[in-house]
Design a protein with these regions (language model features):
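Nucleotide and nucleotide-moiety/phosphate-recognizing core
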Residues: 29-193, 198-218, 233-234
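Short, basic/aromatic-enriched C-terminal tail that caps enzymatic domains
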Residues: 219-236
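Hydrophobic alpha-helical membrane context
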Residues: 12-13, 20, 146, 186
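Low-complexity, intrinsically disordered regions enriched in charged/polar residues
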Residues: 4-6, 97, 223
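Low-acidity, Ser/Thr- and Arg-rich intrinsically disordered low-complexity segments
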Residues: 2, 6-18, 25-26
Length: 236
């Protein structure tokens, strides 16, 4: 292993917790009948140099790894993308009994709000988990805890919040209230996800609750460069 890769892998670990790797993602959860899980794959992957959604991660396309994890907690799988033809093959695949739908991003200015609005309008179930395609350690247990918090609140969105800030691309939203608000913000080209969070009834899961559900903070790590991708594979 090169010194650079070793340093990157150590950096991943230092950013999460000192817990054993075996509990980073526990992978035991209950499927929620009212939860759609939407994976966003509309980015340009400019820092990666190629489409990271389809890059092999430990032998399988990264997006398939994410879908496999989310299938444990959701009752619908959706992929939103600006290039549906490249991911159409996913509609011939099955993940824990669920076949994903691949949906084109809605029209509007490019940016984060377009992704959120596309995800919320594509989903068919009342609650919507929106997750980026480049999060190889996404925790189904955490997604389930977020969904439960939205229902119990009741809230319009529950967002993980840790020392580095909020994690809006691993949050659960209430479709009925959040989809119209997201589309309205998109129409006025207000791209910051914080604008949507501030407009609706939001709640948060803080770091102790996140770790109780997911085992650590590794679930938020994403891979944007070849070096980060290789380092993440060492931890998988």
């Amino acid at each position: 292993m090169s010194p650079a890769l070793w340093a990157m892998a150590c950096g991943f670990v230092l950013r999460v917790s000192s817990m054993p790797m075996g509990v980073f993602c526990r992978m035991t959860t209950v499927r929620r009948a009212d939860l759609s899980c939407v994976v966003q794959a509309g980015g340009l992957s400019s820092r990666m140099g190629c489409d990271k959604a389809r890059m092999p991660f430990c032998g399988e396309p990264l997006i398939e790894r994410v879908l496999e994890r989310l299938a444990l907690v959701g009752s619908e799988l959706v992929v939103t993308t600006s290039r549906p033809g490249e991911l159409a093959y996913l509609e011939d695949r099955e993940f824990d009994g669920l076949v994903p739908r691949v949906v084109m991003d809605i029209d509007g200015p490019a940016g984060a709000m377009r992704g959120i609005a596309s995800s919320l309008t594509a989903a068919r179930l009342p609650l919507v988990a929106i997750v980026a395609c480049d999060m190889p350690f996404v925790s189904p247990e955490l997604v389930g805890a977020l969904a439960d918090r939205v229902k119990e609140g009741p809230l319009d969105v529950c967002v993980p919040r840790e020392e580095r800030g909020i994690e809006p691309l691993c949050a659960v939203w209430r479709r009925e209230s959040c989809a119209p608000a997201a589309c309205e913000l998109l129409a006025s080209d207000r791209q910051r996800i914080r604008c949507l969070i501030d407009r609706v009834h939001a709640g948060y899961l803080d770091e102790p609750q996140i770790i109780a559900a997911a085992g650590s903070l590794l679930c938020f790590e994403n891979v944007n460069t070849p070096e980060e991708f290789a380092a993440a594979e060492l931890l998988a």
